[in-house]
Amino acid sequence: MPNIKSAIKRVKTAETRNSRNASQRSAMRTAIKKFDEAAANNADNAKDLYVEASKKLDSAVSKGLIHKNNAARNKSRLAAKLAK
């Protein structure tokens, strides 16, 4: 446990950001999994789930969770699955 006041604050903010990032990342992965499942079953709502997953990926990029090229690659793969 840190003794310096600023270090104590950094630990607290790191925990807050870590939990926020974890929930954001989890939501992104969940959206991708839902789309994958819908695309595999040729569900009617696959297009809507694709849009939702794309939004989650873009949001993760803007928050610094993933690299923009990673998001672009994932979106490209999702679009290819949607087209099939």
From Swiss-Prot:
Highest taxon above the source species: Bacteria
Region (Disordered): 1-28
Biological processes annotated in GO: translation
PANTHER family: 30S RIBOSOMAL PROTEIN S20 (PTHR33398), SMALL RIBOSOMAL SUBUNIT PROTEIN BS20C (PTHR33398:SF1)
Gene3D superfamilies (UniProt xref): Ribosomal protein S20
Swiss-Prot/TrEMBL keywords: Ribonucleoprotein, Ribosomal protein, RNA-binding, rRNA-binding
Primary role: Binds directly to 16S ribosomal RNA.
Single GO MF annotation: small ribosomal subunit rRNA binding
Family statement drawn from the similarity comment of this UniProt entry: Belongs to the bacterial ribosomal protein bS20 family.
Organism the protein comes from: Listeria monocytogenes serovar 1/2a (strain ATCC BAA-679 / EGD-e)
Taxonomic path: Bacteria, Bacillati, Bacillota, Bacilli, Bacillales
Protein name, entry field: Small ribosomal subunit protein bS20
Signal sequence annotation: none
GO cellular component: cytosol; small ribosomal subunit
